[in-house]
Amino acid sequence: MCGICGIFDRSGNQVDQGILQKMTTILQHRGPDGEGHYIDGEVGLGHRRLSIIDVEGGAQPIGNEDGTLQIVFNGEIYNFVELRKELEANGHRFTTRTDTEVIVHAYEQWGKECVRRFNGMFAFALWDANRRELFLARDHLGIKPLYYVDLGNRILFASEIKAVLQDPECPRDVDVEALAELFTFRYVPSPKTLFKGIRKLPQGHRMTLSRRDIAVERYWDWVPCLRGNFDEEDLIEEYRTLLEDAVRLQLRSDVPLGLFLSSGVDSGALLAIMNRYSSGPVRAFTIGFEGGEKTNEVEDASAIARMFGATHRFMTVTPEDYLKYYENYLWDIEEPLGNETAAAFYFVSKIAREEVKVALTGQGADEPWAGYDRYLGVKLSTFYSRMPSVVTDQMAPLFARIPGRFERMKRGVASLSEPDVLTRFTKIYSFFNAEMKRQLFKGELMEQIADDEYRSKEALRRLQTDVQHLDPVTQMLYIDTRASLPDDLLMVADKTSMSNSLESRVPFLDYRLIEFVESLPPGLKLKGVTGKYLHKRALEKWLPKDVVYRKKKGFANPVEDWFRNRMRPFVEECLLSSDSAVGRFFDQRYIRRMLETDRAGKDQFRRHIYLLVSFELWHRAFMKN
């Protein structure tokens, strides 16, 4: 895993080497092991290397035999060994042992269709000097990031936003439409970012740049095609075989690797499979939080580690540790999020990097397999919408009594009476609902985003279009895997691990596993009220049932309680000071009422406060400096 960047001048002018150098330098944390550049007239490529495969011989950029192809690459092609054999059989000759060089020869052999053959996580830029074209691609699930900005006469791209901002002509303005979407979804859906004009190349997409044209196209998708007749036991064996092969491939490394271990079933299963293929004890790493006893995973994770003879290292994060990191973490992740797990990934990456360069994680099994409560809510809402009004009218007063701290449940209940699936989804996903936004957003901002609710629904409609003929649960699983997974959770994992110069890998997001899951009927994912049904049945092969069916904790933390108590002065300074960015965009009187409600012990605004503080810190990091 590395950091890549580059410039393509559409007017044909020579690339500014000084800007390219600045772009490369600011990505040093992604690749502390080396730096490389390539310039050919209108194109410039930059690379920072974190050496994983062929440590001695894998410096980038890498070219073909005559130098007419040059590539900078971030990520891993896990099936590079098999592809190399196929390419050698077709007459290609290699000078390194890297997966990077496999991409170059795959492009020679299959052209732009080569991306369909890669099993991995990747973002790369390949310069074809004969065609005078720059070819960029991002992996199937969007595990590795790739940003770009069109400045008219030139296009810049990079693994991180801060690199493209090194060009003084790159604007630093807030995209107010993206801001509205952030407060709806808790993240900004692709292709937008919170920076006006800076875009993400979406998952499973490729882009070709030439002086004549900019072409972006999708090369892969997994529109569900549900199986008809099936045998459940056969499906379980098929899934086990695919998962085991995914882990086997992702253990390919020339440097030490380990595992982020929680108390849950997903990382526990990875440990069991890793233990089978590893020559020595697996190194496992876990994070706990002071005051987070209800969600602390260290004890249960230690028991799983002992079960498989793994070495286990853990850290207990204090409020002081968190505050020291939190003031700078928006510089790492580059966009504010309502995702409070970022700190957990940062700290577990920090302790892991002291021993390994690569860590496998259990991310990616919840969104495809219905691992969250909201999927059950969608299923129940389908039944509720079919009930006669005489029944639902009797239930409404009971729903009104749900305490404010159960904010997600209240949102789900509010959607129950909606007959339209898309409207139901919009209510479920709306973090700040329409009424909250009217009170929070200042008048001039509300005028700019007057059609916010319509656009939020349209953002979901774009994702839903290909699956609207399917049941609501399958639709939501598809939307989450296409949107919240790459634009929120995977982005956090990449940025926080790479800020520690650590590569994180996600075996559950092997694209073959996703295609398998998407072929299953919803009843094998969410059976009755049990999420991840067939997934858990398959994992019984490797783990005791009490671990497989243990209540999910995840990398949780008590940060929202810290905000109310020990971090309260910091929170109030961020949100209520007269020179804050929050005060420019939002009504501080409403924010003060939110804080007063929170201090009174009512929980309905805790996560909203977290997002507001994140926005303030992001603005300080990128707009003020």
Give names to the regions the model predicted.
Residues 1-333, 345, 349, 540-541, ...:
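Cysteine-centered catalytic environments shared across enzyme families
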Residues 1-4, 113, 166, 197-203, ...:
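Adenosyl-5′-phosphate
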Residues 18, 234, 238, 242, ...:
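Generic recognition of stable, solvent-exposed alpha-helical segments in well-folded globular domains
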Residues 27, 87, 91, 168, ...:
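A generic secondary-structure signal for well-formed alpha-helical elements
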Residues 30, 80, 143, 164-167, ...:
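Phosphate/oxyanion-binding loops and surfaces in catalytic or ligand/nucleic-acid-binding neighborhoods
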Residues 140, 347-406, 484, 489-513:
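Active-site adenylate/phosphate-handling loop in enzymes that bind or generate adenylated species
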Residues 292, 317, 336-339, 386, ...:
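Alpha-helix capping and helix-loop boundary segments enriched in small/acidic/polar residues
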